[in-house]
Design a protein with these regions (language model features):
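Surface-exposed, charge/polar-rich loops and edge strands
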Residues: 2-345
Length: 345
């Protein structure tokens, strides 16, 4: 995707974060069992090929593994205008009780006051505002939900746009510990965990702490500006329990499972607020304050998530890791394989 270009002499600061990702490397379905996914171990300065089931052997007693316990909503809902025309709403985030930010397709004709019905003819939502797009982002539509049951009863789980296959088992796009329905996308690093991994971690003396960050669809978008600082990072709601934060602060090493956990913990460290909205845009030369190790999937080129990973590692290290992944048949993106990284290595 071409970045925004405001002049012939503008330097594309995202060019160093571009790489060729063949379509066949993008995993279209989850692997079974979950913990059989590959795990690229880049701790200690070397690269070795392991599997997720091995992660307990790569950690130490006293490490604290932090996971995001958010649950993906069945957020894609087909509704109908009074005229009978269909509208697909993708519920992104509940901004306040009963008020949701959504994506609507098609959005044309959804003026303030427009009412949309469920498939049984009952009033489901009412449009109360529109947020016009910036760059080429879709129009956001703010709706009041009249019938809260419509999401659970008639919705389906949305998948990232690069996954074209149909998911036969929707539970495979949920972590096994998901319990807080609030997200439009899964915290994908956590998809690799199953009871085998959790049991192995427990036997090793590695405890697990849970935080929540509501994952939005903007997490999948590449950066479209030439200058890194010009990118407007998406904001997401997070929450960390006080006792959980005390455990994190006291841990010998903090192992973040996924970039959503990184954003959560580093936001709390920066702001001192255990609950709020994170607008933290992590890129070099950001100095990490909490996270010591990071387990994460392979991310799309030119994305804020790739910049986060770059800032976590020694300069240029991410490319060596990604080239190894591409050359050794690792599966990329949401349903793909994972890597374990050590800060500064």
């Amino acid at each position: 995707m071409k970045p925004q270009n405001d002049g012939e002499n503008v330097v594309d600061e995202l060019a160093p974060f571009a790489y060729d990702l063949p379509q066949e490397k993008i995993a279209q379905s989850p692997i079974e069992p979950r913990s059989s996914a590959k795990l690229l171990d880049a701790t200690g300065g070397q690269i070795s090929d392991r599997h997720v089931i091995d992660i307990a052997d790569l950690l130490k007693e006293g490490d604290l593994l932090v996971v995001n316990n958010t649950k993906v909503l069945p957020a894609r809902v087909k509704l109908f205008k009074a005229s009978g025309g269909g509208v697909e709403l993708l519920f992104l985030e509940e901004e306040e009780a009963g008020i949701w930010k959504t994506l609507a397709r098609p959005s044309k004709g959804l003026a303030k006051g427009t009412e949309l019905m469920s498939s049984n003819g009952e009033l489901a939502v009412r449009v109360i505002d529109r947020i016009e797009s910036h760059l080429d982002a879709p129009v956001r539509v703010i709706v009041e939900v009249i019938d809260p049951s419509v999401i659970e009863s008639q919705g389906s789980v949305p998948l990232p746009p690069y996954i074209k296959a149909t998911l036969s088992d929707p539970s495979r796009y949920q972590t096994v510990y998901a319990n807080r329905p609030s997200s439009a996308a899964a915290p994908t690093a956590g998809l690799h965990f199953d009871e085998l991994v959790l049991s192995a971690l427990s036997k090793r003396g590695i405890e697990i702490a849970q935080v929540e960050l509501s994952v939005g669809l903007d997490t999948f978008l590449p950066i479209k500006t030439n200058k890194i600082e010009d990118h407007q990072i998406h904001t997401e709601h997070y929450e960390v329990g006080r006792e959980t934060w005390e455990r994190i602060s006291a841990a010998k090493r903090v192992v973040a499972v996924g970039t959503t956990v990184v954003r959560t913990l580093e936001t709390v460290a920066k702001t001192g607020q255990l609950e709020g909205r994170s607008s933290l845009f992590i890129h070099r030369p950001y100095e990490y304050k909490v996270v010591d190790l990071l387990m994460t999937n392979f991310h799309i080129p030119r994305s804020s998530l790739l910049l986060l990973v770059d800032a976590f590692l020694s300069e240029g290290r991410w490319r060596e890791i990604y080239e190894h992944g591409l050359a050794n048949d690792y599966r990329f993106l949401s349903f793909g394989d994972a890597m374990l990284l050590e800060r500064g290595m």
